[in-house]
Amino acid sequence: LPSPDTEERDRLIGGFIAEHIENESTLQLGIGGIPNAVAGALMQKKGMAIHTEMLTDGMVDLFEAGVITRSPRSTDGGLMRGKMVAAFALGTKKLYGFLDRNPGLALMRGTWVNDPYVIAHNRKQVSINTTLEVDLTGQVCSESIGHRQYSGTGGQSDTAIGAQMSEGGKSF
């Protein structure tokens, strides 16, 4: 699946979000132009980890640039030490080549990866997702525009809740 081109507005939003992400954070990036732009804007960060539902090409780029250098702190008793944690991967041939026999990856059940209480044990967990509508009070809708259904939420609500419960965590 080819990566979509990132539009200028996505890059601006991604840059704004990246300014609010600290070094040594644990990342969850959703699907779409903005999460891809955030990954591109994080290239100067240090000591980052991955605990995400979906592993993407942007995360591989962060790993190859030396940004991803640690594993998330989680409730698994050390089983995931030294690994990037995800439930599935979606991307290009480059991503699938990175997955092949990579001992630094742990693809786990989505029910565990997206469990807010597991996520909350990751220090500075940051959840970044795309939404379709935002109202004046800040409520978001990620499934539809008006009455037309576009997608489901997937693990978005779980990862956002887990990030808010995490010490130093944030959700965008």
Residue ranges of predicted features:
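Conserved phosphate- and dinucleotide-binding cores of soluble alpha/beta proteins
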Residues: 1-172
